[in-house]
Amino acid sequence: MAESIKYIGASTHDLDLFEGQYSILNGMAYNSYVIDDEKIAIMDTVDKIVTDKWLENLEKALDGREPEYLVVQHLEPDHSGNINTLLKMYEHITLVCTAKAKAMLEQFDIEAENIMAVKEGDELSLGSHTLKFILAPMVHWPEVMMTYEESEKALFSADAFGKFGALDVDEDWSYEARRYYFNIVGKYGLPVSNVLKKAGKLDIKTIYPLHGPILSDEIPEVLRLYTIWSSYEPEDEGVFIAYASMHGNTAEAARKMKEILEEKSAKVAISDLSRSDIAKNVENAFRYSTLLCMAPSYDGTVFTPMADFIHRLKTKLYQNRRVALVENASWAPSAVKAMKSEFETMKNIDLIDNTVTIKTTLKENDIDALKSLADEILK
């Protein structure tokens, strides 16, 4: 970190779900920063769950001085949760935000006396540091902006380039950044691409995101991955087998298909949708070039875990992939029809014509059909 930029955020391991739905077994970091200059700026606040630690860090960073500005890059409660705390402590502080954010403050019960609404390219001098504001609408809320400080070559990136996980967890950035991106930001690929073009014109030495570690040496790889992810193109050539099984028969077929594909030197990932993290499954569906869905028929449609998974992909704008379908049925096959009808509504999905219907248990003729499908998948 630059000497003039002080970290005042905090991590927690006391939260089981982020946004009430995403498993965070390794905790979560809520980042906030102080830029120390003639005029002090605080870059965002934090979730209420880490208020005490944030206040402790803030007091230490300020060392008795009063901040002039609070830069509000994103109003989601995990970042705006302590704006009112700050306003009570420093009633004359000026909130710096976009016009859209200013219009939204009231719905978060935030009543600030001094508000500075900024536009694309506006600058704010703190003394030896100058903040330049970069609008980033729909990355991933409409009021979002980023902030660039030229003397330190620092980009404060709001939710972009963030990841799941507390800062005391040592893991490769991409491991949880990928799951974070496709589930939190992924739907908004075009806005992300637009802000990447803006970032590409900047000389960036350090990225300060609102979640996850501060980035420096990793920046070229981070930008490379974000360019791929935001284009909705696959990161890896390979097959993700997503299956759901009621009594174990479809699971057996899925394991057999994995074996067949790997014998043909394909890169394969596999997941039981009934027993795994749906956010991880969404990540893998976007990561690989081909998705193989295998599920039983159920109530005249497709088994519920598969229906939920496909619905989630649809909401995240899943596209530009090859998709293969396998169904299981004892008396009325309906899964392929149901799955196909959903994928046909998605953009640039290449549905493989060859589908497989298994009648309850896996038999030799079914294995032959799976081998034929594997050949189609790997064409």
Please describe what each predicted stretch is.
Residues 242-264:
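Short, charged N-terminal beta->alpha structural module
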Residues 43-45, 67-75, 95-98, 155-159, ...:
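Active-site neighborhood of phospho(di)ester-bond hydrolases with catalytic His/Asp-centered motifs
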Residues 38, 49-96:
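Active-site metal-binding motif and surrounding structural segment of the metallo-beta-lactamase
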Residues 3-59, 146-149, 153-157, 250:
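Conserved beta-strand hairpin/beta-sheet module of binuclear metal-dependent hydrolase folds
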Residues 82, 276-281:
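Short acidic active-site motifs
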Residues 167-207, 211-214, 256-271, 281-379:
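FMN-binding flavodoxin-like domain, especially the glycine-rich phosphate-binding loop
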